[in-house]
Structures are given as structure tokens and as C-alpha cells.
Curated annotation (Swiss-Prot):
Keyword line: Activator, Cytoplasm, DNA-binding, Nucleus, Phosphoprotein, Transcription, Transcription regulation
Molecular function in Gene Ontology: DNA-binding transcription activator activity, RNA polymerase II-specific; DNA-binding transcription factor activity; sequence-specific DNA binding; transcription cis-regulatory region binding
Protein's name in the database: AP-1-like transcription factor YAP3
Biological processes, Gene Ontology terms: regulation of transcription by RNA polymerase II
PANTHER family listed in its UniProt record: AP-1-LIKE TRANSCRIPTION FACTOR YAP3, TRANSCRIPTION FACTOR KAPC-RELATED
Family: Belongs to the bZIP family. YAP subfamily.
GO cellular component: cytoplasm; nucleus; RNA polymerase II transcription regulator complex
Region Disordered, annotated ranges: 114-150
Subcellular location field: Cytoplasm; Nucleus
């Protein structure tokens, strides 16, 4: 039957796809829910020798019946189909445009094709696969949950790793800053010690120089040494104590008072005699004129006393001789 033989009452067409023709395997599904005139205009190439129109009146639309026994889609009307070997798929475009059904068939007409047709039909009628097989949906959600759980675990592990890394970096930075501060303090201390060492060395050099100068001055002072003259009391105590030792302490307190008298007199022999205080005064006058060892003179005078009524006394001639001797010895 050709497209020119189509009746005016024809409101639909049926397409038989030859499995050997691979060019017409693709079917534009947007035209299934449009009117017949638009569908024919948009798909003129579909009307070929393999397309067989059939009359569908307004009140005589072929009824679709789903047999529950084998889930096969049947058309209830006397409509001739091509042979089973040439039939692969049937596309029905009704006037109502509510839905379209694909009936998959092959040469063996096995149960797998029936199951796929039933699944597609139930999908178009609003029957969700999850209502028929909830276990399948549950199994589909399990991988998603495991993936989400793994992602969460990975994020937590990465966060913990970043936190540990930041803590370690902060610890190392603190140690670096502390070591730098210690290094600066050590450098400062070394510089202070270097300055102190320089000052000590300079001071040592100055002390050595001053020590040499003082040593030379001491030598000069020794050459220019001037004997210290004892005081009157020191001279008297020394001479009287020595006289007491020589005379075994036979002098009394009254004799001590007599010995302290500063007197000069002439003895029986006509010698000029000086008591202890007078001797000290005479030696003191001589020390102003010349430098001599007074200690030497005092040591030589001891034991040379002349005992008279005025206490121990020393001849002036003896004193002069000892002074000359002390001057020569110097």
C-alpha cells in the first residue's frame, strides 16, 4: 500500500522496521506526541515501501491489550502484519497523543523481549521500577552511600593531615626563632667578652709600664734614701731600756725621772757629757746637717753610759766619732 492510497479517515500510520535496514533504526520520539498531519510533514521520509498505512477511524481506534500471562502487547482488530522474520519493532502513533509504545520482537520471541516491553510500558504508565523491585534500588543506593562515606573519610583524613602539618610547621618555626635569638645573644656575649679582653690586655700593658717605672723610681729612691730619725720618746725608751738590761734593772722610778732631764755637764775628767735627752737633741741637730744612720749610732752608744747623779750620759766626743763612722759606712 502506498501513501497515495491513504484514506481521508486515516488518522495514524504504522511503521515496520526491517532489521536489515540499519538506517531507519533511529526514530525521532518528539513526533510521537504530535498530531498526524505534523508528524507526516516532519517525517516524510518515513513513508516508504516499508510503511503500511492502515485505516483508523475516530470511533474505531485499535485497542491495546496487555495480556498478563505473557506480558505480550496485542492489537485487537483485523490488521495484517508482515512476516515475523521481517518484523522487528512496531511504532504506533494514535490521535490522542497520550503515549507511544514500542513492542520489541525478534525471531525467537523469547521472554526477555516480553520483559523489556512490559518494563517500558509500565514506565510510560507511571509505574516506577523501584515499586516493583525495591531490592534493585537499594543495591543502586549502596555504592552511592559507600562513595559518599569514602569521600567524607578522605576529607577528614586530609583535614587531619593539614592540621598536623600546620602544627609541625609552627613548632619548627618557633624552634627556628628561638635558635636565632640564642645565636644573637651568643654573638652579643662574644663581642662583650672580646671588648673586655682588649681592655684587660691594655690595662696589663699599662701596669707593666708603670711597674717598670716604679721599679726604677724605687732604685732611685734607694740611692737617695734618707734615714728616718726616731722621736724623743722612742730614743729615750730604747736607750733607757737597754741601760736597764745592762745594769740588771737597778734603776728605780726616781731614777727614771732623773734620766728624763735634759742636761749637759762636764765630768771629773773634763769631758763634756750629754744625758739621754740631750743626746737625742744633739743627734737631731746633726741629722739636719748631714745624713747618717741614727740606728747605728744608737746601737754603738748602748753600753757606753757614764753613771753620774744625772743618770746615764754619753761623752760628746764619743757621739761625734760614731756619727762620723755612720756617715762613712753609708
Amino acid at each position: 500500500m502506498t501513501p497515495s492510497n491513504m484514506d481521508d479517515n486515516t488518522s495514524g500510520f504504522m511503521k515496520f522496521i526491517n532489521p536489515q535496514c540499519q538506517e531507519e533504526d533511529c526514530c525521532i520520539r518528539n513526533s510521537l506526541f504530535q498530531e498526524d498531519s505534523k508528524c507526516i510533514k516532519q517525517q516524510p521520509d518515513l513513508l516508504s515501501e516499508q510503511t503500511a498505512p492502515f485505516p483508523i477511524l475516530e470511533d474505531q481506534c485499535p485497542a491495546l491489550n496487555l495480556d498478563r500471562s505473557n506480558n505480550d502487547l496485542l492489537l485487537q482488530n483485523n490488521i495484517s502484519f508482515p512476516k515475523g522474520s521481517d518484523l522487528q519493532a512496531i511504532q504506533l502513533t494514535p490521535i490522542s497523543g497520550d503515549y507511544s509504545t514500542y513492542v520489541m520482537a525478534d525471531n525467537n520471541n523469547n521472554d526477555n523481549d516480553s520483559y523489556s516491553n512490559t518494563n517500558y510500558f509500565s514506565k510510560n504508565n507511571g509505574i516506577s521500577p523501584s515499586s516493583r523491585s525495591p531490592s534493585v534500588a537499594h543495591n543502586e543506593n549502596v555504592p552511592d552511600d559507600s562513595k559518599a562515606k569514602k569521600k567524607a573519610q578522605n576529607r577528614a583524613a586530609q583535614k587531619a593531615f593539614r592540621e598536623r602539618k600546620e602544627a609541625r610547621m609552627k613548632e619548627l618555626q618557633d624552634k627556628l626563632l628561638e635558635s636565632e635569638r640564642n645565636r644573637q645573644s651568643l654573638l652579643k656575649e662574644i663581642e662583650e667578652l672580646r671588648k673586655a679582653n682588649t681592655e684587660i690586655n691594655a690595662e696589663n700593658r699599662l701596669l707593666l709600664r708603670s711597674g717598670n717605672e716604679n721599679f726604677s723610681k724605687d732604685i732611685e729612691d734607694d740611692t737617695n734614701y734618707k734615714y728616718s730619725f726616731p722621736t724623743k720618746d722612742e730614743f729615750f725608751t730604747s736607750m733607757v731600756l737597754e741601760s736597764k738590761l745592762n745594769h740588771k734593772g737597778k734603776y728605780s722610778l726616781k731614777d727614771n725621772e732623773i734620766m728624763k732631764r735634759n742636761t749637759q755637764y762636764t765630768d771629773e775628767a773634763g769631758r763634756h757629757v750629754l744625758t739621754v735627752p740631750a743626746t737625742w737633741e744633739y743627734l737631731y741637730k746633726l741629722s739636719e746637717e748631714r745624713d747618717f744612720d741614727v740606728t747605728y749610732v744608737m746601737s754603738k752608744l748602748q753600753g757606753q753610759e757614764c753613771c753620774h747623779t744625772h743618770g746615764p750620759a754619753y761623752p760628746r766626743s764619743l757621739i761625734d766619732f760614731l756619727v762620723e763612722e755612720a756617715t762613712l759606712n753609708e
